[in-house]
Amino acid sequence: MIQALLVIICLAVFPHQGSSIILESGNVNDYEVVYPQKVPALLKGGVQNPQPETKYEDTMRYEFQVNGEPVVLHLERNKGLFSEDYTETHYAPDGREITTSPPVQDHCYYHGYIQNEADSSAVISACDGLKGHFEHQGETYFIEPLKISNSEAHAIYKDENVENEDETPEICGVTETTWESDESIEKTSQFTNTPEQDRYLQDKKYIEFYVIVDNRMYRYYNNDKPAIKIRVYEMINAVNTKFRPLKIHIALIGLEIWSNKDKFEVKPAASVTLKSFGEWRETVLLPRKRNDNAQLLTGIDFNGNTVGRAYIGSLCKTNESVAIVQDYNRRISLVASTITHELGHNLGIHHDKASCICIPGPCIMLKKRTAPAFQFSSCSIREYREYLLRDRPQCILNKPLSTDIVSPPICGNYFVEVGEECDCGSPQACQSACCNAATCQFKGAETECRVAKDDCDLPELCTGQSAECPTDSLQRNGHPCQNNQSYCYNGTCPTLTNQCITLLGPHFTVSPKGCFDLNMRGDDGSFCRMEDGTKIPCAAKDVKCGRLYCTEKNTMSCLIPPNPDGIMAEPGTKCGDGMVCSKGQCVDVQTAY
């Protein structure tokens, strides 16, 4: 009876293979659900690394599965994402300029790679779960959290599985009227560089990058400055890694949001707006904030299919080291590709021809694109080197340094000056839990700075040596929670019932045990875990650690939550007295962690 009912419900939930879900990046028609598990960092001798006095760690590792195979994602914080004299500017309704220097070095933006894969790379935001992309076995995968409360579930998908908002290719507005012939390029490449030229090419380059968000884009995101800042940070973190093969480091030196009105008329004609922006940078921006290059992110719809425009070979020029980019798609990877493309033009790189290739494609400097781009072609790298030797731009040779502050100390101006231990702004604006905004001194040790939010969390106390609240501490894994209904696991209290409720709604609960016995079959519909691409049936004691079954309250059914591969019981879920799920098996809680 149960098996027959299961078939009927599966047909209702999966009318065709490939379920669809709306994620932050758009509508995804095929995806895999994974549960990334953080791997504790160990010092020599197997002792766990002590928690740093920062909100985010410098290095992290996460383990999860891709196509049923385990992978380990190594992450390292992009410490050079922000210049040390990074500032943020917005405008009051009356037009007053408001510039601050917020503490941004303890951020959550990472680069990384997949363990044991030499050519892999990753760009990840770890602010709230894992969001970004990584390369695995020659293919690019995107990852982002599923919006399920108290769950570590993430979706992994490929670009081809995202339904495009618009199938029309994005186009760069740069017109190619001065291309050299293939023959002349070949002749140029045959010259032998002098030792001085080789040294110049090998020197690491630094671009202090300034981003302006226009008023249309500000209003499009409902005047939400924090959301806009996160979007820009994620974009520049992605841009940064694209320029690594060119030995260029992109450091964000400033972010400006035109929150009251545009500072010049932003027009649909991209060439006109680019010219106006270059003049504004030269006459207004540079006198008050140094930068090597500035880009305008705009909410305007440029004429035709144009989404960006830039000057070619113009870096370090006061009125031409600029580009404009339309924020045309909710997917950060697409807009970041356009930012990279236009900056490539500033660095002397033209559009790729049909003979230019890169792996994986598409190439960054293609004139038309419908997918994110991650690599410069060999043609682009050659043109960049030729531009460097021809123009010798000097502004990109200086490593970003902090600006000395010599003015009298003022508590509340965001600058840590002589006699101050911290400065988080005014008492009304301060967001630093362990800095006394009135005195600009650290709060005393044992001052509670973060309360425990539930059974599986612990309160945090200031150290007296830092303005930041220590890293969020969690109750140990295996600690009883929710009146012994389950055990803590990585800060959550996972139960089968709560998993059904979050996936299907408050009118659902966990199915009776008879449904879970189906997991002993090990077929496409019911299993415990994957090993080498094979679905392994559950042992009798493990059935509640395999595929999840739910039912409407006051009914007896075996409903599978919607997902192409089903939803599995979350790691750490209670499967018996003193027992928890771990890798598809029901094990003793005392030995599970």
UniProtKB/Swiss-Prot annotation:
Organism: Naja atra (Chinese cobra)
Role summary: Snake venom zinc metalloproteinase that cleaves the membrane-bound precursor of TNF-alpha (TNF) into its mature soluble form showing the same digestion pattern than ADAM17.
Keyword vocabulary terms for this entry: Calcium, Disulfide bond, Glycoprotein, Hydrolase, Metal-binding, Metalloprotease, Protease, Secreted, Signal, Toxin, Zinc, Zymogen
Note: Negative results: does not show autolytic activity, as encountered in viperid venoms. Does not inhibit cell migration.
Positions annotated to bind Ca(2+) 3: D457, L458, E460, D472, S473
Family according to the record: Belongs to the venom metalloproteinase (M12B) family. P-III subfamily. P-IIIa sub-subfamily.
Residue span of motif D/ECD-tripeptide: 455-457
GO CC terms in record: extracellular region; plasma membrane
A biological-process GO annotation: proteolysis
UniProt-annotated location(s): Secreted
Tissue distribution of the protein: Expressed by the venom gland.
Residues carrying sugar: N319, N490
Binding locations of Ca(2+) 1: E208, D292, C395, N398
Protein name (database record): Zinc metalloproteinase-disintegrin-like kaouthiagin-like
SUPFAM superfamilies: Blood coagulation inhibitor (disintegrin) (SSF57552), Metalloproteases ('zincins'), catalytic domain (SSF55486)
Superkingdom: Eukaryota
Binding site for Ca(2+) 2: I410, N413, F415, E417, E420, D423
Cleaved propeptide residues: 21-196
Signal peptide positions (record): 1-20
Disulfide bonds: C316-C395, C356-C379, C358-C363, C411-C440, C422-C435, C424-C430, C434-C462, C449-C469, C456-C488, C481-C493, C500-C550, C515-C558, C528-C538, C545-C581, C575-C586
CDD domains: ZnMc_adamalysin_II_like (cd04269)
Cofactor note as given: Binds 1 zinc ion per subunit.
